[in-house]
């Protein structure tokens, strides 16, 4: 997924495109976005990997966990009031940024 898609997506949340920094290319392509409200994670979801209903369900679940007091990324709605926006065929979401340690080798946390 391209930087151009990320830059176009950023504007849907009122994020300045120059504020994006690529941080991961895995299941999603993730950019860190600096905003006046604090850092955000802009996620470009792989087209066709998950349905729109599945992505919305994920946002609803994270919102419910946040409301219940859990420390999880909180979904941000776009300027159009949506949790998921489409840029062409690419679903996009934005979440609050939670700092933390990277997972160890094999995706395990070394504790």
Where are these regions (language model features)?
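Short N-terminal amphipathic alpha-helix/helix-capping patch enriched in small hydrophobics
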Residues: 5, 26-29, 58
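ATP-binding pocket architecture of kinase catalytic cores
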Residues: 35-111
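ATP-binding glycine-rich phosphate-binding loop
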Residues: 12-34
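A short, low-complexity linker immediately N-terminal to eukaryotic Hanks-type protein kinase catalytic domains
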Residues: 2-16
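Generic detector of short alpha-helix boundary/capping microenvironments
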Residues: 2, 18-21, 88
């Amino acid at each position: 997924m391209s930087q151009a898609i990320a830059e176009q997506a950023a504007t849907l949340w009122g994020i300045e495109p120059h504020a994006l920094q690529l941080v991961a290319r895995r299941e999603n392509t993730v950019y860190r976005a600096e905003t006046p409200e604090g850092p955000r994670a802009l996620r470009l979801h792989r087209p066709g990997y998950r349905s729109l209903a599945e992505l919305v369900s994920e946002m609803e679940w994270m919102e419910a966990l946040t409301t219940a007091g859990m420390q999880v990324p909180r979904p941000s709605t776009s300027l159009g009031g949506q949790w998921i926006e489409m840029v062409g065929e690419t679903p996009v979401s934005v979440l609050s940024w939670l700092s933390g340690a990277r997972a160890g080798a094999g995706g395990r946390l070394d504790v």
